[in-house]
């Protein structure tokens, strides 16, 4: 994992387009209309956009990691607690057997612990993604109905993890986990 740079734009465009193709083939809503915005995140001056870079495949994941979450979905007490907030995770479906989304999430859990931040939080729009996030150790805190979306608010305590094998080999899929 490393911070995204402008030099990553073409690889991120490739990975987002591949994910859009994958989603569309399955009849799922795609991010194709947001492709340019997702690629533009590589130029984010706030230094909160990270990529998972593979020696073999190039950039295989992108994720936003911020120290402040959205103003909705979390209680005032939760918002007052230090946490890393994950959003905008996109992975290359060509390497899904290595579970790059899980690799990125576990990296964030370890990073939070190294920074002394007790929580990693995230939200998602689909129950299938919430189930996948649970395989990464996240728990469902609550659901929140927004105007046009039902959100699954999820959290996991930070902890130090030995990520050597995870980065080298990916993480094995659990039975029934095809993501």
List PLM regions with ranges:
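A short beta-loop-alpha structural element at the N-terminal edge
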Residues: 1-14
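Conserved GNAT-fold acetyl-CoA-binding loop/helix
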Residues: 17-40
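Conserved acyl-donor/pantetheine-binding loop and adjacent beta-alpha core of acyl/acetyltransferases
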Residues: 58-90, 96, 148-149
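Conserved acetyl-CoA-binding loop-helix of GNAT-fold acetyltransferases
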Residues: 91, 97-110, 135
């Amino acid at each position: 994992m490393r911070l995204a740079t402008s030099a990553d734009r073409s690889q991120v465009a490739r990975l987002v387009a591949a994910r859009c193709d994958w989603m569309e083939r399955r009849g799922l809503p795609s991010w194709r209309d947001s492709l340019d915005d997702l690629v533009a995140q590589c130029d984010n001056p706030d230094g909160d956009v990270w990529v998972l870079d593979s020696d073999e495949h190039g950039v295989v994941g992108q994720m936003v990691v911020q120290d402040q979450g959205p103003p909705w979905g979390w209680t005032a007490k939760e918002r007052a607690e230090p946490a890393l907030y994950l959003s905008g995770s996109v992975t290359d479906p060509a390497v899904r057997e290595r579970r790059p989304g899980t690799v990125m999430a576990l990296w964030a859990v370890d990073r939070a612990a190294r920074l002394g931040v007790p929580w990693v939080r995230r939200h998602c729009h689909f129950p299938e993604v919430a189930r996948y996030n649970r395989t990464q150790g996240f728990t469902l805190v609550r659901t929140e109905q927004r105007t046009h979306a039902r959100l699954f608010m999820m959290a996991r305590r930070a902890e130090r993890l030995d990520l050597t094998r995870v980065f080298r080999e990916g993480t094995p899929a659990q039975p029934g986990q095809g993501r």
